[in-house]
Amino acid sequence: MVPKLFTSQICLLLLLGLLAVEGSLHVKPPQFTWAQWFETQHINMTSQQCTNAMRVINNYQRRCKNQNTFLLTTFANVVNVCGNPNMTCPSNKTRKNCHHSGSQVPLIHCNLTTPSPQNISNCRYAQTPANMFYIVACDNRDQRRDPPQYPVVPVHLDRII
């Protein structure tokens, strides 16, 4: 009885730890709206090299993000995808606010190769260019801080396919 209960408690703690890690990956810096944070993470590739481009994101999050995808398109083009038919989000089946791009776009996927928890400026990334479809989650804009020309805006890059 005791070993079974102990094992169950360990499994529960591991599950809660994984949920905490997963939840922390979707936290935006307070100075951004969700749409602004989407644009920063997935549209505004500040350098053609992942290592340099990821420094911007890592500095806001104060950690080395494991991976990130930059869509080589405009924010306006992604906003247009928000007008495509709604679908269930692949990463969260309870969300129905996702939209398929309908056409492939060039993108760069950055993958952390050299973590550096003590100094995030030393994190290094490999990059993989590709042409792929993507699925994006969209929500109504933040009335106070997002530009009024887009009533519905992208807030999460759910999947690349």
Curated annotation (Swiss-Prot):
The places in or outside the cell where this protein is found are:
Lysosome; Cytoplasmic granule
Q: What class of enzyme is it?
A: lyase
Q: Which UniProt keywords apply?
A: Disulfide bond, Endonuclease, Glycoprotein, Hydrolase, Lyase, Lysosome, Nitration, Nuclease, Signal
Q: Where is the signal peptide?
A: 1-27
Gene Ontology terms, MF aspect: lyase activity; nucleic acid binding; ribonuclease A activity; RNA nuclease activity
Active site residues of this protein:
42, 156
Gene Ontology process terms (BP):
chemotaxis; defense response to virus; innate immune response in mucosa
Task: Spell out the family assignment given in the record's similarity comment.
Answer: Belongs to the pancreatic ribonuclease family.
The protein depicted here goes by the name Non-secretory ribonuclease
